[in-house]
Amino acid sequence: MLDAFSRAVVSADSKGATIGSAELSSLRKYVADANKRIDATLAITQNVSCIAADAISGMVCENTGLTQPGGHCYPTRRMAACLRDGEIILRYVSYALLAGDPSVLDDRCINGLKETYIALGVPLSNAIRAIEIMKIATVAIMTETNSGRKMFEGINSGSGAECKDIASEAASYFDRVIDALN
């Protein structure tokens, strides 16, 4: 995983050139958005357990057979595994968001996820639904559209309304995970 600065240096070095004005402009934007990235990542990390638990609960409410004997969230150790997986996905989304680079998500989370779930007999449609719910909740927290909670009040980045671009980026990382499972 390379941050924006490392990527610019590696790219310029591979070309045997100095860092160009387009790259510097991109780095300026990255620096300008740094507080928003930190605050958005904080929004995820402070709410990771709730986001994952709500997503798994939502998935189960939509398919109550999951918690019945023979269901994929029965017994409780399977439910715990679902919660753990949700938290892991959120963790890697937060890493990608902070770095502004999805490679850590691709390399350490997405790579082999579908094959692992298939091997374990996890219904991909249920996993995808849980990730969709996590995406919706995360974006709502970042943009402060979740039942009035003011995540960014008094924080450097301003308001959640000012973080829509970062929330959109976070949503794209969830979409990467969903696409990998399709």
UniProtKB/Swiss-Prot annotation:
Q: Does the keyword Oxidoreductase apply?
A: no
Arranged from A to Z, the UniProt key words for this protein are:
Bile pigment, Chromophore
Share the record's PTM remark.
Answer: Contains one covalently linked phycoerythrobilin chromophore.
Tell what triggers its expression. Constitutively expressed at low levels.
Name the residues that bind (2R,3E)-phycoerythrobilin: C82
Tell me which InterPro entries the record gives: Globin-like_sf (IPR009050), Phycobilisome_asu/bsu (IPR012128), Phycobilisome_asu/bsu_sf (IPR038719)
Q: Which GO terms describe its biological process?
A: photosynthesis
Provide a GO CC annotation, any one: phycobilisome
Q: Which domain of life is it from?
A: Bacteria
A Pfam family (short name) is Phycobilisome
Q: Does the keyword Kinase apply?
A: no
Q: Which family does it belong to?
A: Belongs to the phycobiliprotein family.
Its quaternary organisation is: Homodimer.
Known function: Green-light absorbing phycoerythrin of unknown function.
What more the UniProt record tells us is: Prochlorococcus does not possess phycobilisomes, instead it uses a divinyl-chlorophyll antenna complex for light harvesting.
Q: What is this protein called?
A: R-phycoerythrin subunit beta
